[in-house]
A protein has these predicted regions:
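Hydrophobic transmembrane alpha-helices and immediately adjacent juxtamembrane helices
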Residues: 1-281
């Protein structure tokens, strides 16, 4: 009797244990933690590549600064603070843009794009969180570049962390939307890397857009945010000192372009599925 009872209890107990040990469904918290940890591992395991990116950015800035001094002399010295701030925002913008567009392009080339489609989260949320994780890393590397630029030029800027992070973060959110749109086009047409890289140089025109002379340019990506970041880092204006209209416009432009880029991405991937070219390369 006791042996039979013990035998009958064994499977039942194991059944309860199996039920208790069933894996819990992953949440967006787990996804965000995973992609952040992935970026950390990439930085730690391939530090030469990360350091190389910083060196290349500093090389271009040094060429711009020294060449400008030879050509413009004192005129460049008088406006060097604005150039430093603009270059800082440009490095952030390129990082935010390429974080989505180049990453999706790489997934297409490697043939690993389909694994994002099969996740329970969906393709677009995974790409968005991976882009945000790369933006966090870009902020850290751009901060190092900014510090070295200040040392090279001998200039001083107002660096209120909260204001700089909020204004710069909202400014490049619109570029993240452009990256989404470019990533969707990459999924659909595959080899368009040259066109995507060309758009990065257009960020220079957006950052230097004359928003005071041409008010309509404020609705373009980066333009309004660049003007606000100049006031923050050069004039020392704090976040709560800006007019509510300026802050509302900054948020509206950021959210508008992010949603627009997200919708383009969704449309392009859906069309690629219909055409049967999602995994083709």
């Amino acid at each position: 009797m006791s042996a039979d009872a013990s035998r009958s209890d064994g499977p039942t107990g194991n059944g309860h244990a199996a039920v208790d040990e069933e894996p819990r469904p992953a949440t967006y918290y787990h996804l965000a933690r995973a992609v952040l940890y992935r970026e950390y591992l990439i930085f730690v395991r391939y530090p030469a590549n990360a350091i190389g990116g910083i060196v290349v950015s500093l090389f271009f800035f040094a060429a711009l600064f020294l060449g400008g001094q030879l050509l413009a002399g004192q005129a460049l010295t008088d406006s060097i603070e604005g150039i430093v701030v603009g270059y800082f925002l440009w490095t952030l913008s390129v990082g935010a843009y390429s974080s989505v567009s180049n990453d999706i392009g790489s997934e297409v080339q490697w043939g690993t794009l389909e694994r994002h489609i099969t996740t329970p989260f969906g393709f677009a949320p995974v790409a968005l969180l991976k882009g945000i994780a790369k933006v966090v890393r870009t902020f850290l590397t751009s901060a190092v570049i900014l510090a070295l630029m200040l040392v090279i030029t001998g200039t001083q800027l107002s660096l209120a962390p909260l204001t700089v992070v909020v204004v710069a973060g909202l400014s490049i959110t619109s570029v993240l939307g452009l990256g989404f749109a470019a990533g969707g086009v990459t999924v659909l047409y595959k080899q368009i890397g040259n066109w995507l890289n060309l758009l990065q140089f257009g960020f220079v025109a957006l950052i230097s857009a004359p928003v005071f002379d041409l008010p309509w340019t404020r609705v373009l990506p980066l333009a309004h945010g660049s003007a606000m970041l100049q006031r923050v880092m050069v004039d020392g204006v704090r976040l709560w000192e800006f007019p509510l209209v300026d802050l509302a416009l900054l948020v509206a432009v950021a959210v508008g372009y992010l949603i627009g880029g997200y919708l383009v991405f969704e449309y392009a991937t859906a069309r690629a599925r219909r055409l049967g070219v999602l995994g083709d390369y």
